[in-house]
Each structure stands twice: as structure tokens, then as C-alpha cells.
UniProtKB/Swiss-Prot annotation:
It is an enzyme of class 2 (transferase). The modification Phosphotyrosine is found at Y697, Y797. Pfam families: LRR_1, Malectin, PK_Tyr_Ser-Thr. Keywords: ATP-binding, Glycoprotein, Kinase, Leucine-rich repeat, Membrane, Nucleotide-binding, Phosphoprotein, Receptor, Repeat, Serine/threonine-protein kinase, Signal, Transferase, Transmembrane, Transmembrane helix. It is found in: Membrane. This is Probable LRR receptor-like serine/threonine-protein kinase At1g53420. It catalyses: L-seryl-[protein] + ATP = O-phospho-L-seryl-[protein] + ADP + H(+); L-threonyl-[protein] + ATP = O-phospho-L-threonyl-[protein] + ADP + H(+).
Length: 953
């Protein structure tokens, strides 16, 4: 079916074109040609213009929609002015691509309703012609490189409701013509270079619900006119330069959920009436000059969300209701009168509590692996900084503390507490252990050293940008800025890690000389509202640091009267002797002799991972002792080991009889070395030496999900419902990364419960990429070698070798059912009688009782709504038609509750119904009737045991 059969209504994240004809549904040739030019300009050349039935819906002779997903498509062209050849165009959504150039002014003649261009490389001004688009309701240009003044003509938009211009380089004042935008509900200009004050005319925007003016360049004070915006739910103003001013009048704004007035030079007391706005979910008044006591009315906020009064001049006592709230309340940098032995000191971050701190001893150095485990780097021990994310105040055993203020807030007012991030870029570092994880903060991150010897020091702050990637896609477009304070003095304004280091994944070390006079050192990193907040995803911003090293800057004096020249001579002679000794030893052991072709091939890969010697691996595994053998991987046995620095590792050893062979081993190394995600097993390095082919992974403490759910009784873990849901979401995130976010588009091909490992905190990590296949160019191809596990394999792959990422989606659906059910997918009643969990799901669908699938071991201790959602998603994922399965990014959104499960698609999800499957379903009914009695008896015994145990206590 050709392109000329269809009409288009909008060109968007989904390109939608809707048109109504009385008797025909043919696209005029002129518009068809225009559409082809559009795709060429966007450099989107791989769209099949023959319409897939999954993408078009029609009624009789009237074609209603055609959709083409162009969001996150890594488009690298420019914006096509040829869209004017599609006169019925209503929507443009090219968000999160890599498009460059300017915005075509020609678009001003189109009847557009929505323009979404978030997250690209667009430059130049906003076309003044946009003021002619009277139909426009939404203009989203956030996270680009647009510049110039805001056009006066934008004030002529009578229907505009959403104008998001944050994270650009706009300058000048907000035009007075904007006073006419009385339909606005959402206005954002954060992270720009605007000038002037916040205009009084905003009082006319009486329908406004969201107003974001963070680090915009505008100066204070906050105008009195803001009191008229009674519909406000989300007000964020921060880093507002200008004179001191009293707290703005917000008494009549009673729907407020998020209020951020951070670093706005506010003075005076905290207003009593704020305590009467019970809709608050997030209240941040930090880094102002507010004084006085906390009003009694604020007790009404005790069951609310988050309160940050950091960095003011508040005094008096801390109310009892604010004690023991953990990271949800921060009162640091104030003047409260507190007994150092009071619980407030431990739970509310009141700095006065450190005045009477007793040092265990004095130190002449400080080394911290921020966000990571303890490790040794060139003989120097970097202390662990991996405390619980729910704590905002951490006390080490060696005289240093850290304070992490804030939670990340998205558009939905949903706060998220994240304090550690793992690497998702390609690291180009030597001491990679210091940079694979980092400490992050949403507002302010402070380290205090209280027990240093007095003297001169060099404070070295180690940074590497690990949350953006360096590829030519939207994930490389993020910009992180924060300020660096040393001893409460601003040393660096708007520090940008990637820019300083010349790229993401590179290391930059900032050194600051400091004289310590009272044994105390303070390092503070502060987010001043600058930078993107939605790239590569929402809530990515704020300070990030990998490590801290503080060393004395004074060289030790020569002893015993030895001159400096003599000392240097001895050092040179000793160094030469050591070099010859090491060279001879290595030659004797064969390390410097000619290497095999395999080793040469490995060296040519130039991978960004560690290369281990065979001797290191043998020592770590006790010469591959069978006692350290922990399993069988895709290549051969897997051993547990311990490196010299104490790091526990898992070593995958290629068996000599492996069918996959050396070539695929090297391919796996090349592939895995480019992948970094919290839900993928981390590759530390490899060894290609002496005929041995070894991969060195992080050791994952709790083995596989399969063993935890339905392995031998002694290996099973009691996984409660929140943990199961967390595991399911983690696996989905890992697959979404493989399919859509990594530089290489990868299909795993063997997703199953045994290939999902659980770490100490029961976070899931996808393992065994030995069967993975790169999905580089074609979205669909025929696999020359079927690889996977029956029962988890998608039907189109198992029967026809038809491989796409939707095969992994199918396998994920099976794993999700296992997580809910707590039993293996494959059930063998006899040698010739095998059936699968998906058959039982169909039985329960017929009975309209899907919740019967939930693991009976959970009893009633699970969230019914979440369980139903997970089952429904699994059903959609296991549809027999690949095009009916959702993408993994859609699965993540549905699991996290950010997107509703579409009932229509759920009903459309088809399942094979061959005679054999119907027989299996009948067998399933009988089987579950039988085990139902066993489970009932078992649960009764468990409940009885619990009752007896409770009675004993």
C-alpha cells in the first residue's frame, strides 16, 4: 500500500495527519512529495512509507491517523521549512533528538496547536512569525541553544497555555506585550540570561498554575503582583539577584503544592499563614536571610512532604514534630539553640551540634571515594561514602561528615531521593574505580573535616561527568552547572564538569590551596538553578563529585643532614635498579615475549576497561578452586574471587569446548565495555593471556532471581511485594537502556530469571550478554542462529528467526509473570507433558480473576492495583504480534505509574490458541487445582507458625 493512500493531521512525536474527505482517502501528490522532503531534511531515511497495520486506524473510507515515532530517534538534520507543504499540520514534536540549525519562520503560516522541540541543538532566535499562529496552545523549546530577545509578537497568541523556554540563552526583558497572555497556565524561563525585574503584569495571568523563574537572570524583588495568581500550584523562583526584600504575600494562594523561593534575598520572619496551606508537598526557603523562630502553625505541615530551611538565620528551639524526619527536613546553617546531646543534632542537621565533637585523633590527609566503596588507589585508601540514601547527614569514623540537602522534583510534584549515581557514559580514566559512581545532590552537598592538623593543604576535588554520554544524540546535550565553595568562600561559579574535562567521561581535578588554622575544612557544592533538568531524563541536575583528596602541601624536610642533591641521586640510582629488576622478572615469566593472535586482537580493541593478568586472576580465585565455583555462564564456569584491594569479583572463564568461540568472546568484550547502567552487571575488566579468555565482573551477592523465587528451598529469599515491583522496574529499565538509550542498540535474546542477578539491596542486574546481538541498522532482521531459552522466546523468533527488540519485550513479560507468581514459567508434569505459565494466565483471564496469579506466599500483603498493572503489562508484552507489544521505555512508564495501561491495547493483545495450547490450559486448570490445596495447607502452617512465634514474644 503506497504513501498516496493517506492523509496527515500532525507531524509529531507521533506524526499525525487527519483529514476528512467525502468520498476518497488519497493524499495529494504535492503533499506526498513535501513529506518526503521533510524526512530527507530530518535525515530520517529509514522510514518504510508502506503503512503498517499497527500504525493506522480507519473507518470505512476515511483514514483517521498515521503515526511515526520521531521522538528520541537521534535525528541529526535540521528543521524542515517544507512542512508548509502540509497545510493541515497541527502538531510538531521532535523532542529529544540531535537536530541543529534555526527554527524556520515559514512555520508561522501553519495552523499549529502544539510545537515541542525540547532537547535539541537549535540555535538562533524564536521566529517573530510565531506570533501569527493564533491556534497555538503549547510552545516547548526547553534545553536548546536558542538566543536573542523574546519576540514582542509572542504576546499576540490568544490561546497559548504553555510556554516553556528554560535552559536557553535568551536575553533582554520579558516583553510588555506578554501581559496579554491571559490564557497562560504554565510559564517557564529558568536558566537563561534575561535582564530586568519580574514584571508586575504577571498579575493578569490569573489562570497560571506553574511559574518557573530559576537562575533566569532576572533580578528581585518578587513583585507584590504575584499575590493575584491564586491558581498557582507550583512556584519556583531561585537565585534572584537584587536588593533584600520581605517575604512575598502568598496568603491567598491556597492550592500550592510546590513552593521554592531559594536564594532570593528574602528577609524577615517566616509567615504564619504558610503553615495553613496543607496542600504543600515541597517547601524550600533555603539560603535566604529569614530570621526568628519556626511558627507554631507549621505543625500542620508535619504529615506533609519536604521542608528545607537551610542557610537562613532562624533561631530559637527546633519543634519536636520536626525531629527524626531524616532527609525530609533540613535545618542546617541556622542559629538554633540546641543541646549537642539532643536527638535534633542527629536527625535535623543542625551544625551547632558539631561544636563539641571529640576527634578520635588528628589527621594530615583526607581521602573519600564519594558515593563509592572503600578502595586502594596507588597505595592510598579512599574511604567509603556509600551511606543510606534516606539519610542526609553522615558521620564517618575518621573525623569527617557530609550533609546532602534536597530531593529531585519533577513536573508532577513527585520528589525523588537520589544521592548516588552510577556511570552511564564511556569512561576514559585510569583509576576507574573512583569514577564509576558519584555522589550527587539536588540542592547542596557539603563535606566537613573536623580533625585535620593545622597547616597548608591542597584540596583536590575529582570530577567526571558520568550521567551524560558523549555520542551524537540528545543524551549528550545535558548541561550541568554548580558552584564550588571552599571554607564558605565561592571559588568557582557555574562549574561545568564536561566543559572543564573537554568531554563527558573524562576526569578533571580542581585543586584549591587551603590553610587550616582550627582543624576544620568545609567543602560545599551548590546548585544555583543553572543547567538542563530534563536531559537525558527529568531530574538530572545538581552537584556531582567522584572523589575528594586532601593532602599536605608541605614536603617533609630531609633527615640526618642529607642534602637534597644527594637524596635525588640516590632516588635515581634506586629507580634504575628497580626498573632492571622488574624488566628481568617479567622477561623470565614470559610477559614480554611475543603474544598470541588472540592477545593482539584484544589489544587492538582499545577498550575502556581494566586489563587483568592471569596471575592476578589465579590469586583472586585461588587458582580457580572448585570451592569458588558459583555457577555456569554463557561461556563456561563462573568463579568468585577477591582482588588484592578487597574487591569481590565474579570471573567468567571461557570453556575450551565453547561453541561461541574466541571471536564472539572478543565481540562480547567490545560490546559490554560500552554499556554502563545500574541495572546491568558491571564489567570491571578482562584477561586474554596464555590461552585463557576471562571476563571480570562485579560480584552480585544474591545470585539469580530464579534461585530467589523458585530455586532450592535453602536459596529462596522472602521477596515482599515492594521488592518484587522494584526488581521488575529495574529489569525494565535495563532493557530500555539496551534497546533505546545505549550507543549500540542491543537485543539481549535470552532474558530469563536466571539471567537477572540480585545485589545486596536486591536491586536487579541483567547478566550474560553472551547471546546478545547488535541491532545496529535494521529494525527487523532474520537471525542466522537461534539462541535463547524455550518458554521465554518470542514465537516469531523461535519459529522464524525473526529478531527485533520486541523479542526481549516478550521474554520480559514472562519474567514479570514469574515475579508476580513466584513460580517458574515452565512446568513439567511428565516427560511428554510440559506447559507454561502464560497458559495459566489465559485461564485466569477467562475467569476474570487475574489476581489469583499472585504468589500465595504473599498472602494479602501486596498492592492489588500494582499487581494488576504488572500482570496487564506482562500480557501486553507477551502478545503473539510483535507490533502489539509496547517498547521497554513505555513499560517503564507504565510500571512507575507515569503512564496508564491502555485497556484497548490490552484487549487487542492476542495469544496463540493452537490445539496443543488449549490442551495445556486444561492441564493447567487441573494442576493448579491440585497445588492449590498444597499451598492452602502450607499457608495455614506458616500462619500457625507465625502465631506461635508471636505468642512466644
Amino acid at each position: 500500500m503506497s504513501l498516496n493512500r493517506f492523509l496527515f493531521t500532525s507531524f509529531s512525536f507521533f506524526l499525525f495527519f487527519i483529514v476528512h474527505f467525502a468520498s476518497s482517502a488519497t493524499l495529494p501528490t504535492q503533499e506526498g512529495e513535501a513529506f518526503k522532503v521533510v524526512l530527507t531534511t530530518l535525515k530520517k531515511t529509514n522510514i518504510d512509507l508502506n503503512v503498517d497495520p499497527c500504525e493506522v486506524s480507519s473507518t470505512g473510507n476515511e483514514w483517521s491517523t498515521i503515526s511515526r515515532n520521531l521522538k528520541r530517534e537521534n535525528l541529526q538534520g535540521s528543521l524542515p521549512k517544507e512542512l508548509v507543504g502540509l497545510p493541515l499540520l497541527q502538531e510538531i514534536d521532535l523532542s529529544r533528538n540531535y537536530l541543529n540549525g534555526s527554527i524556520p519562520p515559514e512555520w508561522g503560516v501553519l495552523p499549529l496547536v502544539n510545537i515541542w522541540l525540547l532537547g535539541n541543538r537549535l540555535t538562533g532566535p524564536i521566529p517573530k512569525e510565531f506570533g501569527n499562529i493564533t491556534t497555538l496552545t503549547s510552545l516547548v523549546l526547553e534545553a536548546n541553544q536558542l538566543s536573542g530577545e523574546l519576540p514582542l509578537e509572542l504576546g499576540n497568541l490568544p490561546n497559548i497555555q504553555q510556554m516553556i523556554l528554560s535552559s536557553n540563552n535568551f536575553n533582554g526583558e520579558i516583553p510588555s506585550t506578554f501581559a496579554k497572555l491571559t490564557t497562560l497556565r504554565d510559564f517557564r524561563v529558568s536558566d537563561n540570561q534575561l535582564s530586568g525585574t519580574i514584571p508586575d503584569f504577571i498579575q493578569k495571568w490569573t489562570k497560571l498554575e506553574r511559574l518557573f523563574i530559576q537562575a533566569s537572570g532576572l533580578v528581585g524583588p518578587i513583585p507584590i503582583a504575584i499575590a493575584s495568581l491564586v491558581e498557582l500550584k507550583d512556584l519556583r523562583i531561585s537565585d534572584l539577584n537584587g536588593p533584600e526584600s520581605p517575604f512575598p504575600q502568598l496568603r491567598n494562594i491556597k492550592k500550592m503544592e510546590t513552593l521554592i523561593l531559594r536564594n532570593c534575598n528574602l528577609t524577615g520572619d517566616l509567615p504564619d499563614y504558610l503553615g495553613k496551606i496543607t496542600s504543600f508537598k515541597f517547601l524550600d526557603l533555603s539560603f535566604n536571610k529569614l530570621s526568628g523562630a519556626i511558627p507554631n502553625t507549621y505543625i500542620n505541615l508535619r504529615d506533609g512532604g519536604y521542608i528545607y530551611f537551610t542557610g537562613n538565620m532562624l533561631n530559637g528551639s527546633v519543634p519536636d514534630w520536626m525531629v527524626n524526619k531524616g532527609y525530609k527536613i533540613d535545618l542546617s546553617y541556622n542559629n538554633f539553640s540546641v543541646d549537642p546531646t539532643n536527638a535534633v543534632c542527629k536527625y535535623n542537621n543542625v551544625l551547632s551540634c558539631m561544636r563539641n565533637y571529640q576527634c578520635p585523633k588528628t589527621f594530615n590527609a583526607l581521602h573519600i571515594n564519594c558515593g563509592g566503596d572503600e578502595m586502594s588507589i596507588n597505595g592510598t585508601i579512599y574511604e567509603s561514602d556509600k551511606y543510606d540514601r534516606l539519610e542526609s547527614w553522615y558521620e564517618s569514623r575518621n573525623g569527617w561528615f557530609s550533609n546532602n540537602v534536597g530531593v529531585f522534583v519533577d513536573d508532577k510534584h513527585v520528589p525523588e531521593r537520589v544521592t548516588i549515581e552510577s556511570n552511564s557514559s564511556e569512561l576514559n580514566v585510569v583509576d576507574f574505580g573512583l569514577y564509576t559512581q558519584a555522589r550527587i545532590s539536588a540542592i547542596s552537598l557539603t563535606y566537613y573535616a573536623l580533625c585535620l592538623e593545622n597547616g597548608n593543604y591542597n584540596v583536590n576535588l575529582h570530577f567526571a561527568e558520568i550521567m551524560f554520554n558523549g555520542n551524537n544524540n540528545y543524551q549528550s546535550l545535558g548541561r550541568r552547572f554548580f558552584d564550588i565553595y571552599i571554607q564558605r568562600k565561592l571559588e568557582v561559579k557555574d562549574f561545568n564538569i564536561a566543559k572543564e574535562a573537554k568531554d563527558v567521561g573524562n576526569v578533571v581535578i580542581k585543586t584549591f590551596p587551603v590553610e587550616i588554622k582550627d582543624g576544620k575544612l568545609e567543602i560545599r557544592l551548590y546548585w544555583a538553578g543553572r543547567g538542563t533538568t530534563v536531559i537525558p531524563k527529568e531530574r538530572v541536575y545538581g552537584p556531582l563529585i567522584s572523589a575528594i583528596s586532601v593532602d599536605s602541601s608541605v614536603n617533609p624536610s630531609p633527615r640526618n643532614g642529607m642534602s637534597t642533591g644527594t637524596l635525588h641521586t640516590l632516588v635515581v640510582i634506586l629507580s634504575i635498579f628497580i626498573v632492571f629488576l622488574v624488566f628481568g622478572t617479567l622477561w623470565k615469566k614470559g610477559y614480554l615475549r611475543s603474544k598470541s593472535q588472540m592477545e593482539k586482537d584484544f589489544k587492538s580493541l582499545e577498550l575502556m576497561i581494566a586489563s587483568f593478568s592471569l596471575r592476578q586472576i589465579k590469586i583472586a580465585t585461588n587458582n580457580f578452586d572448585s570451592a569458588n565455583r558459583i555457577g555456569e555462564g554463557g561461556f563456561g564456569p563462573v568463579y568468585k574471587g577477591k582482588l588484592f584491594d578487597g574487591t569481590i569479583i565474579a570471573v567468567k572463564q571461557l570453556s575450551t569446548g565453547s561453541k561461541q568461540g574466541n571471536r564472539e568472546f572478543l565481540n562480547e568484550i567490545g560490546m559490554i565495555s560500552a554499556l554502563h547502567h545500574p541495572n546491568l552487571v558491571k564489567l570491571y575488566g578482562c584477561c586474554v593471556e596464555g590461552g585463557q579468555l576471562l571476563l571480570v565482573y562485579e560480584f552480585v551477592e544474591n545470585n539469580s532471581l530464579a534461585r530467589a523465587l523458585f530455586g532450592p528451598q535453602e536459596t529462596q529469599l522472602r521477596l515482599d511485594w515492594p521488592t518484587r515491583r522494584k526488581i521488575c522496574i529495574g529489569v525494565a529499565r535495563g532493557l530500555a537502556y539496551l534497546h533505546e538509550e545505549s550507543r549500540l542498540k542491543i537485543v539481549h535474546r535470552d532474558i530469563k530469571a536466571t539471567n537477572v542477578l540480585l545485589d545486596k539491596q536486591l536491586n536487579p542486574k541483567i547478566s550474560d550478554f553472551g547471546l546478545a546481538k547488535l541491532d545496529e541498522e535494521d529494525s527487523t532482521h532474520i537471525s542466522t542462529r537461534i539462541a535463547g531459552t524455550f518458554g521465554y522466546m518470542a514465537p516469531e523468533y523461535a519459529m522464524r528467526g525473526h529478531l527485533t527488540d520486541k523479542a526481549d519485550v516478550y521474554s520480559f513479560g514472562i519474567v514479570a509473570l514469574e515475579i508476580v507468581h513466584g513460580r517458574s514459567n515452565k512446568i513439567e508434569r511428565s516427560k511428554n507433558n510440559t506447559f507454561y505459565l502464560i497458559d495459566w494466565v489465559e485461564v485466569l483471564r477467562e475467569k476474570n480473576n487475574l489476581l489469583e496469579l499472585v504468589d500465595p506466599r504473599l498472602g494479602s500483603e501486596y498492592n492489588r492495583e500494582e499487581a494488576m498493572t504488572m500482570i496487564q503489562i506482562a500480557i501486553m508484552c507477551t502478545s503473539s504480534e510483535p507490533c502489539e507489544r509496547p517498547s521497554m521505555s513505555e513499560v517503564v512508564k507504565m510500571l512507575e505509574g507515569k503512564k496508564m495501561v491502555e485497556v484497548e491495547k490490552l484487549e487487542e493483545a492476542s495469544v496463540h490458541r493452537e490445539t496443543k495450547r488449549l490442551e495445556n490450559m486444561n492441564t493447567m486448570k487441573k494442576y493448579y487445582e491440585m497445588i492449590g490445596q498444597e499451598i492452602s495447607t502450607s499457608m495455614s502452617m506458616i500462619m500457625s507458625d507465625r502465631s506461635e512465634s508471636s505468642a512466644d514474644h
